[in-house]
């Protein structure tokens, strides 16, 4: 350890000494440049550059020394160019002069400084100087010194590289873009060789350290390729001259670090259009790389780049079209053609951006498969990563052509899932997550889930996953269907969808309730305009949902409700055997509700569903089915509803549904409402009995509607209900409860009197008003301690919740409002007789 510290201290000391010499020489050089003593400035700069021969420095320390000298050389080069332009000195003479420097490293740095300045002057012998500099730089073969020397050559000549063509005047002297290509390619080749040789410097035990140092220096080599990409080359030059030369050097160097980095630079530096026309060369190169190269990264990088290119160009074209349409609309003097063809909603971005003659789908897929097959030892996770990238390309660039994406799933199914040697690896968590991510891609990028169902190999890959991952994927499927709002209309689509979501349905316990609710919501997106197909879809849903066990109560109700409203469609789309189909539909509804009833924990739900079915059956004029559903609801009420509070609430629901019916025969309707009134009279609590009976009176007095000219009305039974409710109200021991019920019954009398119910006469109302007012006076003189409301539910909550108003005051106000209503109608002779 002490030896290592001593060596590091010596290297640091050597760097400090070199920097001190460079700083002193730089100050002297600047002073001589200011006084015009150019030869002395060269001498000072040369002394500073001699330190670039220091072999004791690490690459990082050498870079520090290099950057300091670059600043001095930049100042020198700027001054030289200025003196040449003002005629003080001639750069060509200076170029020959600096070649007499004693040491090769300072000599070449000075030659590059003077030569690069000369390249920027008019009438410069560009081609000659470029070739000379390239040849002279071969004189430094030390890997580190040569690498930085050529990097300096690259940076200094950037502005002076020719960009013209052979057709231009003085092309032989000024050079052409091909000369620039040759210059950069040769410099790249030599720099790469030097970079690769760095690994052989020093002892073998420091190989990993040198590899790390090489990794830090790779940008110096890659800059050559970046400069090539900035020459604005045409595709022919790139394909015929640039790329082959670069690829040749990459393959010949046989260094995995260099190969991987440089191929990645090619992918990132050159334009997308160039890549599109040289994919064969790119992927052919990937196959020829050393076995230790991570080809996955190189393939994925190219696929991702092409995907982003297609998306970017497509969005740009769409934006330009929208702007063009906006401008056209704003030009009022230009008549807009109303028959402009609308954009095809199913236009694939790839079809619009990439010319069809490129056959990009076939080319990419064949190359991907070839790369995977050429690397027999490629890890499984790397294969999945490549497949994920090509799938991402197909989905984002060709979302309306699922046949391309299906190739990926077919490959996974045949070469991964069905391979006996890989079965153990399939259960590894990282691979499971990677396959899960692949399965989620179609859900993200396909316009609707129906396109996923066209993937014949999607379900086999899905079924091969771990149950927990299948559950997560199924949950995502349901969420995407709901989010995108696209309906699935075919029976086969619905059945295939259920094959995916069955993992949610069959999961036991309460942990999946939110997901089950989403499954129920998903049912609304399974629609077919043909009611016969729709009922088959609902049957498939029922057959799958019953596998949910005790959780079936969260799923089947939506099927029942969809069936109930489907009955209306059968009326609209009547076919030859529509009556038989309606019968089967109602039988199916009854079967579904029976499944819920047998579940034992859905009694209220079953009763509500029977009532909804009965209501729809009556509306659609199917009285026999409506009667059957009401009787089923009555059976549940009689046999299973035991809680008194629940009985009261359920009875109110039954009364409400029955009151809306209009298509029963008189006998059937009379049977149902008589039974309902009987239920009201058997409620446990007196106030409930009273309320139930006076509400049931409405069943005996239906109001005529537009289509119902002869509603069911039985004045005698109305009066009987009201009188019986009065008797029960009078029997209530609590005075406040009794009074409240009396007021409510009085309002019912007013209602039926207004409806011209023959059994309700003014004498009855007058007597009830007197009796109610008498009870009110009796309460007002009673002791407050005696007024204990035993059943607050008998009072309207809106009354009792009024702040700072006592119960008695509320009842008094209620009675006054009721009687005031009748008094306002006293102009009518019928109403005035009430108060006589």
UniProtKB/Swiss-Prot annotation:
Spell out the subcellular localization from the entry: Membrane
* InterPro entries named among the record's database cross-references: Vps35, Vps35_C
> If researchers knock out this gene, what phenotype do they report?
Leads to sensitivity to thiabendazole and microtubule depolymerizing drugs.
Q: Which terms are listed as keywords in the entry? A: Membrane, Phosphoprotein, Protein transport, Transport
Give one Pfam family, short name only.
Vps35
Q: How does it sit in the membrane?
A: Peripheral membrane protein
Q: What is one GO biological process annotated to this record?
A: retrograde transport, endosome to Golgi
Write down which residues bear the modification named Phosphoserine: 316, 318, 783
GO CC, sorted alphabetically, is: cytosol; endosome; late endosome; retromer complex; retromer, cargo-selective complex
Subunit structure, as described in the record: Component of the retromer complex.
The UniProt function text for this chain reads: Plays a role in vesicular protein sorting. Required for the endosome-to-Golgi retrieval of the vacuolar protein sorting receptor vps10. Required to form proper forespore membranes.
Of which family is this protein a member? Belongs to the VPS35 family.
Name of this chain's protein: Vacuolar protein sorting-associated protein 35
Q: Which organism is it from?
A: Schizosaccharomyces pombe (strain 972 / ATCC 24843) (Fission yeast)
